[in-house]
A protein has these predicted regions:
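Flexible, gly/ser-rich surface segments that form the specificity/activation loops bordering the active-site cleft
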Residues: 108
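Glycine/threonine-rich flexible loop motifs
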Residues: 115-117
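A short, flexible beta-alpha/helix-coil linker loop
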Residues: 111-113
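Conserved N-terminal beta1-alpha1 strand-loop-helix module at the mouth
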Residues: 1-71, 75-104, 120-126, 130-139, ...
Length: 183
């Protein structure tokens, strides 16, 4: 994971979300601190789910899902200086998340994904378009994003894309290709 993050940074990536659903809090914190040390301040680091570990590791923000702490509680923990992102999977969730003080909202899965054990229903490009109509906040599209479909997702209204599987096995090369495709 650390080597991949270093390659992503070398490929021009400026924001990485650290997501570890299986590791113990101690392991996650150790990895997160090493990630921060290794990348310095050249890359914004977002902690998945855990506001406490975000603060302890010196990350730039927290991303929460629908089953995590409510955004208002997370904001009380992290303060106003750090970023807060919220995952949404349908128009109702997006409308509620839009009323929070999150800096950005994620919408997805846009396409079928293998990165989650039990993913929510696919929203498709139409889901991204609808989300764009419902919020003025930056939208991050997630779920099944590849170099082949990233441009269409941005054209549908996403400000950014979140990618896991299509960055491997060559993170630097893949990141550079994403930047070339997205301009």
């Amino acid at each position: 994971m650390l080597a991949a993050a270093e390659e992503l940074s070398a490929g021009g990536v400026t924001l990485i979300q650290y997501r570890d659903k299986l590791g113990s809090p101690r392991h996650i914190l150790e990895q997160a601190k090493e990630l921060r040390r290794m990348l310095g301040r050249s890359v914004r680091l977002i902690m998945n789910d855990r506001a406490d570990l975000c603060l302890a590791a010196g990350f730039n923000g927290v991303h929460v899902g629908q089953d995590d702490l409510p955004p208002a509680r997370v904001r009380r923990v992290i303060g106003d200086a750090l970023w807060l992102g919220v995952s949404t999977h349908n128009p109702e969730q997006l409308k509620l998340a839009d009323q929070t003080n999150a800096e950005y909202l994620a919408i997805g899965p846009v396409f079928a994904t293998s990165s989650k054990d039990r993913p929510d229903p696919v929203v498709g490009l139409e889901g991204v378009r609808r989300a764009r109509q419902l919020t003025g906040k930056p939208l991050v599209a997630i779920g099944g994003i590849t170099r082949a479909n990233a441009r269409s997702v941005v054209e549908a209204g996403a400000a950014a894309v979140a990618v896991i599987s299509d960055l491997l096995p060559s993170p630097r090369k893949s990141a550079e290709e994403f930047f070339r495709i997205l301009g």
